[in-house]
Amino acid sequence: MGGHILVTGGAGFIGSHVCERLINSNEKVICIDNFNDFYNPELKENNIKGIVRNPNFRLYRASITDFDKVKDIFNKNKIDKIIHLAARAGVRPSFRNPGLYQETNVKGTLNILELAKEFGVQNFIFTSSSSIYGDAKIPFSEDTLVDNQISVYAATKRCAEILCSTYHNSYGLNVTILRLFTVYGPRGRPDMAPYKFTEKIFNNEEIEMYGDGTSKRDYTYIEDIVSGIIAALEK
């Protein structure tokens, strides 16, 4: 593949696995992560402990909402490709702090797109979410309309998708949007169901049920997600 690859949110669950795969393939990786307190930041430190000292890995502790700081990172590094994973996650928390979700997921994405345009990035991968489908019929279809978001989180992800499409149409930026369905696996986020259920089972605690227990989720294993992201980056 070659060149320098920027991974935003690279110390998170998915991002750390992406960085690890790239480093193991001898790629040069620039990682931006703000190590926020959505969950214990020490978990993120642990996520990247195996690669943080690798000479092909550069870590910048910064927020994608800080345009000037991120631009400085672009100025210091020849970034050829971008995997944009950084985002405020979580459906329920998005209702409690909608402004923060807009700031990170919309404005932050706009910052990265603008810098990608300015610095001539070759390929831009944006990771969206299955939540944008709202209460769509099952099974999902790629032709399903996505104008019925039912959470602030989903709305911000859809806004970011539209921005990505606009930068492709207006500036020719090579953009690929991936709508990820619930990801699970090693180093999974502690707020996600697999982590919570496992912890409660080990502690012999009751598992809280939302609704009537008939809802279903599509789960995707982390290594499959990483393979898909890398394939999109190489196309």
Task: Name every feature range the model reports, one short phrase each.
Residues 150, 181-191, 211-223:
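Glycine-rich "substrate-gating" loop/helix at the edge of Rossmann-like oxidoreductase active sites
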Residues 40-43, 189, 193:
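Short acidic-hydrophobic sequence patches enriched in Asp/Glu that either
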